[in-house]
């Protein structure tokens, strides 16, 4: 094996490890706000199913009611599935991103537009590829996070844990139930990851220069701006996919992503597609932390700098 091939394998392993570790730490820290986001986002579906007594008036109301009814530890409900899911997801995203970017072979000297498009394509392809491996865990995390205690059902939960989600879903809907909402997820992940990686890689050499070069704070803020923009653009797709996830095990289901989108807009209004978006913007701080921690950890531990 040539020295270049060995170096590529080493870089791949570094990308896999650093991306996964950074993601696991960041997602655990952001678990409370992420659960609030999922509860607010799916509250209309939860009310239909009788698992929520009344709508949340906002982020603060959701925090207060959840803490009072379920306890503080409940904010980490579904976090185990999220960490299990997020570790390989982010690790594969970061690892495949650089691999796929090499396949495009575009250099900045060949033209900024082509180079920027290559970054978008590599980031999007990496995200979509990773999704194939971990979608069922994303489904389970959503069902656990949206499984609130309801007085209408005597305070009982629908699921007792990660394994229970799999058992009940497979029993009622089969393997297809674990992949409900997959197609809008693929579209959403391409949009989100494409912007997430592509814009960061493209804007970093333009913004993080001079005194800002190597600055963790500057890298973090740039990452936050990028993740906020990317997540807001793709948020309606995220709402559609999660609402489709919520129908597994239910008698009434949507006939695809378009049908789901139409029914949400018709019965709840366009604004419903963005419910929980405010909490999602706060949650994106974790995403910014991941991408900046990824850079910093590689520079500290391995002396690797991106160009």
Swiss-Prot record:
Q: What else is known?
A: Present with 1080 molecules/cell in log phase SD medium.
Can you say what this protein is called? Answer: ADP,ATP carrier protein 3
Instruction: Say where the protein is mainly found.
Output: mitochondrion
Q: Regarding domains, what does the record say?
A: The transmembrane helices are not perpendicular to the plane of the membrane, but cross the membrane at an angle. Odd-numbered transmembrane helices exhibit a sharp kink, due to the presence of a conserved proline residue.
Q: Does the keyword Transmembrane apply?
A: yes
Q: Which reaction does this chain catalyze?
A: ADP(in) + ATP(out) = ADP(out) + ATP(in)
Q: Which domain of life is it from?
A: Eukaryota
Which sites bind ADP?
85, 97, 241
Topological relation to the membrane, as annotated: Multi-pass membrane protein
Native organism is: Saccharomyces cerevisiae (strain ATCC 204508 / S288c)
The entry's localization annotation reads: Mitochondrion inner membrane
What's one Pfam family here? Mito_carr
Sorted keywords for this record are: Antiport, Membrane, Mitochondrion, Mitochondrion inner membrane, Repeat, Transmembrane, Transmembrane helix, Transport
> How does this protein assemble?
Monomer.
Segments carrying motif Nucleotide carrier signature motif: 241-246
**GO molecular function annotation:** ATP:ADP antiporter activity; identical protein binding
- Activity regulation: The matrix-open state (m-state) is inhibited by the membrane-permeable bongkrekic acid (BKA). The cytoplasmic-open state (c-state) is inhibited by the membrane-impermeable toxic inhibitor carboxyatractyloside (CATR).
